[in-house]
Amino acid sequence: MIEINNKVDYIFYTNNTPNTYKIKLILLELEKKHSITFESRYINITKKENYSDEFVKINPNKKVPAIVDQTGEKPFVVFESVSILIYLAQKYNTFLPDFKTNPHENSDVITWAVWQAANLGPAFGQYFHFSYFSPTVQEYSLHRFNNEAQRVLRLLDDRLSVSQYIGGNEFSIADIASAGWLLYLNFAPIYKATKERFPHIFKWLDLINQRDAVKEINQSISEGFKTFNPSALRALFTDDPELINAKAPIGIENVVLKYD
């Protein structure tokens, strides 16, 4: 039985990571634009709370983000970040062009939102995992996912050289999907992503950084950097205390790039 809190429109399951920041961002935008209400519930994956019976009822895939929509007669669960973005955008008729009147624009936005989940997110996430959370050095994995991160960054920079926003001429869920990962570049040159190498991405960042909801996400990311702890996550993959407490296998800044 899904726990209900009738005081809010949505229950949002999060752990303050890139994929969950996408959903927090659209919820903040909808809070301002449509006066929706939501409650955040933190799922601590280092304590394996995502495997709890309660959470598995929400998402059988055992991952965040997920939301429970309580605005209807019965609570309705949506999981997978881009699925949530599309669901909310369609429900409130915002951040996604209407298919009936603008089918091509609608398709462009959805394509770039799905592109993020299928390409940018996996490349960034896997490279970051093998850089900081892997108990041992995996050189092949590091180079493979670094090269893929460089490829998707170059592709996105090319896209933004001809389009003000990722999905077209207006801010959309395509931007929200990528923002969950790319807002980190405001604080550190992760993946060697600098303004000199990817000027159009940073121009886009300057543009969306002006939004109030984005400012709030940036604040959360800034606070997260202060408490970054690879050891806690490494403990999910090994019981060896030496590996858990070892220095990260390789620093982001030391990776050899092949797409300079």
From Swiss-Prot:
Belongs to the GST superfamily. This is Glutathione S-transferase domain-containing protein DDB_G0274223. It comes from the Eukaryota. Residues 102-233 form the GST C-terminal domain. Pfam families: GST_C, GST_N. One of its GO terms (cellular component) is cytoplasm. Residues 7-96 form the GST N-terminal domain. Gene3D superfamilies: 1.20.1050.10, Glutaredoxin. One of its GO terms (molecular function) is glutathione transferase activity. It comes from Dictyostelium discoideum (Social amoeba).
